[in-house]
């Protein structure tokens, strides 16, 4: 064990945590030829199109086991489902290059959520109602095992409406071809108070107790952001309900809404169209302000409305699906294993010029099982179990003691492609620093101000990953523990400020708080999956999840990156169990698939 904490010197952060200046701002309305969910200002900043991709750069940063096409641009997941033995992942895709535009529905299939076969696009821009783009949508499986896609299309004037498509041949196990309904669009924003350029991203449909289908669509109604509610007898003819499923005055337009049922303390998934067990809750998710937020509540069947358990006017305090580079998520009920799975889009945080040099841009996070915590207050997430099939070369350590300033190197795993699970046991909780509730408004700012180099009572402790030999490049994923009047609060941070020597990158310090009963359980868990330029971390059993994109030069030096466990807090931290694996490369859209062409 080395006393080597000197590498974490204080870092100049000049606005690195000021999200209003540091991050691209997601906006509403038509954008760069269309907008259908999860687009932002950076999409318009396109570099010259005649730049040739660099194989070396593409290989250095391209992931080994995350979902992404073989080349070109991708963004939102759209319509994931399990059908006749295959998982289907549709996604927003530009077949013509690694920049936003010409959006169609990419399509891949898998039997295990890990290895994917890339197919021809399922939907392309070829009708008046979607000539501007085949934007985000969902898949619903109708009675009799009939899948139907409902998606947002933009016309030549960029007005948005909802369209439907059916598989041409349901006996085709891959469902390669889809036929659009002759009466598209089936749903227009033609009622008073609606905004025709803020009407998109329909949810999966569900059947109510009256036998009618329901569906929510993101939109604006009389200046309110809303999940607009519609009903239908046949999934073709829709009528707007007089009131939204839920609305809010004061937030930006809600993109990519999602609505599903969950059971407290039970990771079994629920089909919203089936009978919902007693005691179940409902989650309403919306993509807004560059992040994915959600509320927990109940679905009032009499009112046909979502009622949150806690009404929070300040949207900065709304719960988050992920505290990092994660947007436009989509979930589905996996009937194969009786679980709910969620994906999100993780955009690049370098530049459009870099994307052209790489020849690709964007990826989807590892599929996650999502369920409700025992206390019913928040959602928990964990990578699907199938990803563990890529684990190899396990190393394990027990009984590590980390005093202030200690580093423990985790050797004999590929530091570029690794899965690390570690538990931190607190010998004492008496040294916890006091908690300031105002920090909840901007945990990223607090992570930036109290970085891993600033000692605390309990913490920071965690992992240093993708570290170069001399530590001039490294990323820190860590915890700090605070004591409020009645409970303990844990801050989880993913600090990218020294992740790369390159100056032209977004390098924030992401962060989120979660409550933890340290009187009952003294061990805080951390799982971090490292996949070259993508890092996903799950803290406290999935209470806080942070997706980060990093571009260190050390990725060019095979075998030269390092992983460490560390502690820089006054209180000693014990590691009862540490396990790490090298992750094998998955086959993602490269074998005999259209996307590999």
Curated annotation (Swiss-Prot):
Organism: Triticum urartu (Red wild einkorn)
Originating gene: 1-FEH
Residues forming the catalytic site: 76
Protein name per the record: Fructan 1-exohydrolase
Record key words, sorted: Disulfide bond, Glycoprotein, Glycosidase, Hydrolase, Signal
Catalytic reactions of this protein: Hydrolysis of terminal, non-reducing (2->1)-linked beta-D-fructofuranose residues in fructans
Broadest EC class assigned to this enzyme: hydrolase
Record-stated family: Belongs to the glycosyl hydrolase 32 family.
Annotated EC: 3.2.1.153
A Pfam family recorded for this sequence: Glyco_hydro_32C
